Structures are given as C-alpha cells and as structure tokens.
Amino acid sequence: MSAHDLKLEEIVNAETLRRKLNELADTADESYTSLPMRKVVLQTLKDALASGRANAEDMLMKDGGGTLCAKRLCYLMDTLIDILFEFATTRAYPTRNPSKAENMALVAVGGYGRGGLAQGSDIDLLFLLPYKQTPWGEQVVEYTLYMLWDMGLKVGHSTRNIDECIRLAREDMTIRTALLDARFLTGDKDLFRTLEIRFEEEIVKGTEPEFIQAKLAERDARHRKAGETRYLVEPNVKEGKGGQRDLHTLFWITKYFYRVKTKEELVKLGVLSRAELKLFNKAEDFLWAVRCHMHFATLKAEERLSFDIQPEIAQRLGYTAHPGQNYVERFIKHYFLVAKDVGDLTRIICAALEEQQAKHVPGFNRIFLTFSRRKRKLSDDGAFISENHRINIARPDIFRQDPVNMIRLFHLADRHGLEFHPEAMQSLTRSLKLINADLRENPEANRLFLEILTSPRNPELILRRMNESGVLGKFIPDFGKIVAMMQFNMYHHYTVDEHLLRCIAVLSEIEHGELKTEHPLSNHLITTIKRDRNLLYVTLLLHDIAKGRPEDHSIAGARIARRLCPRFGLTPSETETVEWLVREHLTMSMVAQSRDLNDRKTIIDFADTVQTMERLKLLLILTVCDIKAVGPGIWNGWKGQLLRTLFYETELVLTGGFSELSRAARDKQAREALAERLSDWPKEERDAYLALPYTNYFLTVSLDDQVRHAHFIRDADQQGRALVTMAKPHAFEAVTEITVLAPDHPRLLSVITGACAAAGGNIVDAQIFTTSDGRALDTILISREFDTDDDERRQAERVGKVIEDVLSGKAHLPDMLAKRTKPKKAARAFKVEPRVEINNTLSNKFTVIEVEGLDRPGLLSELTGLISDLSLDIASAHITTFGEKVIDSFYVTDLVGHKISNATRQGNIKRKLLALLGAENGARTNGRSPQAAA
C-alpha cells in the first residue's frame, strides 16, 4: 500500500507542522517549558490532531477503506509524536553534550505498534533507555506524556531499558506480545535495533510452543467472556469471536513461529493460499472500517456494535434495504460472514502450524493434543483415519474421488465421538466447490445427513462443525441463505442459523432428560413420540429457514420443507407432518401468550387447528425448543405454565374429555364446590359471599384460588378495609400474583397497572372481575425477580403498597411514572409500526382488541386508561413482550356486557389506540407481521 494510496499529505503535513512549531519557538520570549509556550505548542498539536482526524473521517466516507483509515490515523499519531518528541529533546530539554545514558528511543507497542488505529484507540508507548533512567530522560518523558494526555489521548506507557524489557518479556506473556508488535517511532534507532535482536534471540527462539499455547488459551478465555458464539447480535468488534483480536492472534502466532513481518510472506511459505490472503485482507479491512466508523460516530472508543448505533454505522457503510431485509440486517449479516471467514482462517493457520512445522519444534504437538501418533482406519475404504482422537483424511484426494465423503466425514466423527483434525477441515474448506446438485440429490449423502441431524448423541455439535466449515449451507442452499442472518430487534439474541442449531441442542437435552425439572411436560412427551422424534429434529432445522424473505417465513418455510423432506428420505406422511409443523410453529406460542386460555372458544379453535394428539405433542415440544433457543432470559416459568395449560385444555377436547355443559350448569357446579370448601363458615355468611362473584369468575378461576380469594375478602371486610392487596409468589411459573380488592371504577385497571409500572413491576397477565356489591377483584401477574419466595414476596408487597397508596390518593401516579418513562437506550434504535386489530370471532362473549407497538414504561397503564375512557369493560389482559415490541390483547365488552359490533365505534376505538401507540414512535423498518417477526 503506497503513500499515494494513503494520501497521507491530506492528513497532516509534517514539514509544515514542524516549521510552524519551530517558528513559534524562535519568536517566543518565554522559556520553551513555560506555561504560555506550552499552551501554544499544545494548541498547535491539538489543531493538527482535530484536522487530521476530520480529514481521515471524510476520506473514509468517500473511499470506504478501513485499513486505509487505520493507517492514516496511525500516520497522524506518528507524525505528532515525532514532532512533539523532537521539540521536547531539542527545545524544551536539549542536551549539548549528551552522555551515553542521555539517549532514548520512542517505540510504539501493542496495537499502535501494529500500525493501525481507530480514533479512540489507546496509544501504547515504550520509552526505551540504554541504561537506568536519568534526570534528563525523566523530564523528556514527563513533558511528552503530559502533552499527549492534555491533547485528550489515552496513552499507555512504560519506561524501561533493554535488560528490563527482556526480563519482563520472559516473565509476562502480555508484555512479550506487546514487544512482538514493537515499531520504531523516533529517537535512537540503533537502541531499538538492539532490542529487536535480543528479543529474537533471547525470547522468541525455542519458545514457540509456549507462546502459541498461551495465545490460543487467551483467545478461548476471551471468547468465553465475550460469548462463545460469533453470532451475538450486538458483537464486540474488537474482542468478540471472529473480531479484530482473533485476526491479531493469528498474525501473532504466525509472526512468532515463522519469523515473518508481513502476511504476504505466509503465502510464500505455503501457510495461506493467495485466495486466503485476500480473504484475510478483506476481513481486516472490513473490521477496521466498522471500528473506525464506530469511533467517529460515537466520539469515543466504542467497541460493541450495539443496537442503538447499528443503523448509523450501516448507513455510513452504504447498506440499503432489500426485499425481506432492511439495511441494518444486511450490514450485520455481512459482519457475521466476515466473522465466519476469520474462523476459517483460524482453522487454516492452525492446520499449517501443526502439520507443516510441528516436526521442526520439539514438543509442539503438545499444544494441540499429545505426542501419540497412533492411527486407525475408520472406514472400509481407508479414506478416514482416527489420529490423536481426531478424524483425519488418509489421502488428500478423498473428497475429489467421492464427494459423499464430505458428508461421511461428519457422520463418522459423530459415530466415533471424534474431534476434527485441522488438516481434514482445511482440505474440506478448500473442496466446497465439489458440493453440487448431484451430491445434494445423492441418496447416500442424504441418508448420512439425516442420521447426523437425528443423532442420539450430540447432533448440534456436528451440525455446528458442518456450518462453520461451509458444508451445511452448500448442501442445503436454503440454509445457506440464513447463515449469519440477524433480525434487527431486541428479542432475538442470535443469528437465524445459530438459533436453529441451539433449538436442536435444546431438543437433544430434553431427549436426554437433562431438562426434566424445567420442562416436565416436554420431558414426558418426548418418551411417547419415539417414532416421530426424527420429525422434530427436521422441523427444528427448517422452521425458520425462510427468514429474510418478503413473505411470511412460516408459509414459505413450509414449502421448503415439502421440497426438502423427500430428499432427506422422509415418507409422504412424514413430509406432511413436518410441513404442517413448520407452517404452524408460532401458533401455540401466540395462542398461549396472547389469548385468554379460560375462554372456551380459544381452546376449541386451537384444537381445530391441531386436530390430533400426535401433532399437539410435537407442537408443544417444538414451541418449547423454539422459545428457549431465542436467547438468555427469554424462556421463563410463566410461558411454560401457559403452554402446559393450553396443552392440557386442548388434550381434553381432542380426547373427548371436554365438557359441553351449559354455562349455567357449570356455574352451578362451581358455586356448589366452593360452598363445600367453605363449609366451616356460618351459612348466612357463606350464602352472602357466594352471591358476590358473577358467573365468569366461577368459570375462570380455579377452586383453590376461589377459596383463597374468599378468605382474603372476608378478612378485608372484618377489618373494615375497602382497599387491600395480597401477594403470592409462584416460583415454578416464575411469576408473582398480586390480587387487588378495591371499589370499582372505570379507570381502576389503568391506575393499578400504572402504579405497578411505577414500582418497577413487569406485568405479564391480568384478570379483572367485579362483584355484585360494586367492588373489583383484579389479579395481576408480574415477572419474578428474586430466587427466594421471601425476597419475592417482599418485592411484591412493596408493589402492592404502591398500588394502595396510588388508589388511596397518598401518591401521585403521574409524578411516579414520569421518573420511569425514559425508554431504554437500546429501544430508541427501533421503530415498531403501531397496529390495532379488533376481532369478534376469537371469543363467544368478548371482543378481542390486540395492539402492537413500541414498548415504553407506563404503556399498559395508558392503554387500559384509554380503553376505559372509551366506555369499555376489560375482562382480561394478556401482555406479551418481544424485546422492544409489545403485543397486548384485551378481552372487552361494552358497559352492558355486549361485544363491540358497530363498525363506526370500532373505527373510533382503533383510531384513538393507534394515536396513543404512535406517540414517540414511527414506521417500522422491516414491515413484518408480529408472527413473522417472532
């Protein structure tokens, strides 16, 4: 890369800047170290820094060159430090007859030493001395550092002589790595050269295994800390898996092992092909571009590509929307594909290190496994061998001779429980062009693949290796389209392909009984569907395979399943089941979380969709795996309880156990059952209480809860309390129930939900009942926050106290909400198009109003308040949150208990709710339906 390409003269003109400082010094009356002179020098350097950075940003916006930008910013810093150091040693603290000790080399180390910087990067400097520090040296170092700090730079520094550098490099791997990147800046070049020679002879030589082992272990620890997958949707560009640090690690170990100065030398040595070198350079350039843009956009050393800055970075890089994917999603997909390329390069270089050079370095193989070179054949044709507990190819041409071997490699690894030899993976990666239409339709290849996918061992591990190598996306091109695809929202934590692999991992854990405490129903059901277990694995691999297309991914995915399943060897009946499961994979979750499961029509409609117990079982397990694999914290006990309730209620319909008794008959039975449980009450008091609740209460609430409510209301009446709350933790369901007894009025639920929001409670469900004497008995469920019931009860009682204070007028709700209405920073990056649907077919008794919008503190209170203002009674509310998006369903009637059937009134309700949802919101960028986005 030439200076002409870099256009360095547009960044800073070194001679002009040097001349300007000298002219200032020549005309100054003060001492060069005086405060006025120091201010002048500082301002001159700061102006040059600001101008150079601005020019670098402008050039980045024009040419898009990430590596160019990093080198330009590094040149800017080199120039400023060189001129500053010259001023310090010739003007501020000159030496007329310097001794040998009054000498110094200024050296860039660490990231700065590698020759690339982003705007906010640390500037790591080594003040290299020939002997011990001198008073002159202390003055120069102090002057230089304070000027750099006052320029606003983050400077890391050390002052050492050569002996100290060598001793510390021997003891500390971090210091050794920093010196490996050492680059001369200014001062005594011979001194620096002496350090280089001694570092090579005394530190590097003979310690290659030690260094490489340490760097790979350091990388693994960093990945564990940042997140094992390279597909986290808010990646750390510098430290994350597949990020810049991984590229640095690769170059460190090759530089240390092969004694190279540039990546180009690795091609001459046969470590990388020219295509792989090009891949390395492209990955490096892209990551530098992203990181430089992040620093420029945020005006700080921002390394995490968080949701709130992703749109701006995507725009800066020039991404545009395509059908089915917005510009942010296209950018992040490109990012993850680059991260995957970095993983490929890691495997290639590790293979070269182990196989090409290990024999030259005693003990090198200990880095990877053991000295043992025992080999055994794994296949009759001798194509594969087991070597050090890893599968390897016996000959370099086995994939070309029989492309089915590209699938057989993974099948054998699974069957024998082997890791993969780097040489085999390198050969595989370089043979991907062999995967063509003939191989995809090959019956043996598909038989082997289905056995891998449905393996009773650990299918996720092998599929992950297939995906990382590129084989999975080539063998199933539809899968290849969703590799590295992200969805720009706060709900999905992983890319689509990563989510699918994690779904398969969850299913395998359920099948092995590892999740029986958390998922008892799924754990039981999996043992009853042995004949259909393969269908679940196939469905989980395919259920989101059509994401990123303009149409509903469930419908498009079902078509893909219909095409692929016969190829995998499934029968027509099995194909039909998988196709149905893919098409309906969101249905059970949607019904469980956003519909009233106490409403009989909800259950009957869902049973009509499912039709058979076999499908119900498969759909329940599929839904559990799908939700649990979305990301940490998405699954909770409340969702599990909703799914179990829906399963059991639907099972009754499908098996003929669902009672068709009239409402009146069921109401009579329920009152009689409660009367029996309250038999110790005086008859007059018992009869009076049984007359309080309306029919809907008895048909909805469990008998145990009815008994608890009866004692709750009785105690309140005996104490003369019109307003009272009660808390009950439900540990397994991960919710806490707060029951509120209060005089009924139209906006009561709005006040309760608002008070709950003000107290920090996250409402997931609400049931609203009134009594015949004009009171309301409302039950809200809030997400569990604590591990122990005692802590959770105290928190719930605090929320209940806030509710009581607000309802009694002791606290002012608007003031309390105002303190919590600022949305989360990440949520501000998103737009969710407001949506309101009014449906009279989902319930026989109620109109269902479903609203969707951008979540914000207090939104539920605003919605319920507006619904009350529109003269509607809310019977139940069901709250579902998908990251930044909320979908709330309200079961309502008018004030006389009728559905809302008038079209004009429906239009007015919809218009006002849309206006409320639209406040502080805009049009959603992806334009997907709520189901499609889930």
Swiss-Prot record:
Domain HD: 496-613
Regulation: Uridylyltransferase (UTase) activity is inhibited by glutamine, while glutamine activates uridylyl-removing (UR) activity.
PROSITE patterns: ACT, HD
Superkingdom assignment: Bacteria
Pfam annotation, one family: GlnD_UR_UTase
Enzyme Commission number(s): 2.7.7.59, 3.1.4.-
GO molecular function: [protein-PII] uridylyltransferase activity; phosphoric diester hydrolase activity
Domain (ACT) ranges: 737-818, 848-931
Swiss-Prot/TrEMBL catalytic activity: [protein-PII]-L-tyrosine + UTP = [protein-PII]-uridylyl-L-tyrosine + diphosphate; [protein-PII]-uridylyl-L-tyrosine + H2O = [protein-PII]-L-tyrosine + UMP + H(+)
Protein name: Bifunctional uridylyltransferase/uridylyl-removing enzyme
